């Protein structure tokens, strides 16, 4: 058993070492080669150049241009070529020695020519001496019509600045066209249908809510019930039911005290008692008379349930289905 454990331990250690070695080898394999091992290293070495400083592709060394602001003439340095500076200047562009005369007093401006930058060398030992420059100026002075090979860049900038600016004509002021005022007519307000007067009442529908024999309706219970049914105290000191539940609009039907004088005092409702109340609706009325009568009948039944009374017709008779149908016929007769 101990030998088996030892063998398993050795095998596990060997497996771990193999996994680590394989991981390091994979990481090294995925890393990019260094610049020294790259096969493109040879491309970055300096190519061989000939005696004139040009390589096999005809590309020369980097040229540096220097300007001498004190003398007004840029100093030029020759390259490694053996050709003298004055000879190269004469070979590059032949001089036209024939002088040109003009009768006009205004001097003519020479057309700008393509300027060739001189080849400069960054080596201070190869700069042209002042005597050499004087000889070059004397040699070039024989051809007055020949333009200088090296023109001062500041002079070119001044000549460019002398060029006349293009004329910009001021835009002619155009008188604005007369705009006629447009009259906007206000939209007519929606016409409200004028309410036709109802005229004199032709019929009155009456319902009674009376207390049971030997009892009375209590005002402390009557007032909350009336407010719940959206009645509002108003004209003639009685309660009215309006078109709107908030107590606004036309009166649909009213509620009065059955006992003379038939009025209520809201401040004394807690001490108020009565034998009954009466609900009445005149015909014709505002709105739908059938709907108004249905609301009045439901209110009468609700008050009877809340106060412990009963509903009677206009003659204080028992309310029945036949009585209801007769009331509906009276309503339809007025429609």
Curated annotation (Swiss-Prot):
One of its GO terms (cellular component) is cell division site. It is a single-pass type I membrane protein. The keyword Hydrolase does not apply. Residues 37-128, 163-185 are annotated as: Disordered. Residues 1-6 are periplasmic. Its main location: membrane. Residues 170-185 have a biased composition (Low complexity). GO terms for biological process: division septum assembly; FtsZ-dependent cytokinesis. It comes from the Bacteria. It holds the Pfam family ZipA_C. It is found in: Cell inner membrane. Keywords: Cell cycle, Cell division, Cell inner membrane, Cell membrane, Membrane, Transmembrane, Transmembrane helix. Residues 28-335 are cytoplasmic. InterPro entries: Cell_div_ZipA, ZipA_FtsZ-bd_C, ZipA_FtsZ-bd_C_sf. The chain crosses the membrane at residues 7-27. The keyword Cell inner membrane applies. Coiled coil: none annotated. Interacts with FtsZ via their C-terminal domains. HAMAP family: ZipA. Essential cell division protein that stabilizes the FtsZ protofilaments by cross-linking them and that serves as a cytoplasmic membrane anchor for the Z ring. Also required for the recruitment to the septal ring of downstream cell division proteins. Belongs to the ZipA family. This is Cell division protein ZipA. It comes from Shewanella loihica (strain ATCC BAA-1088 / PV-4).
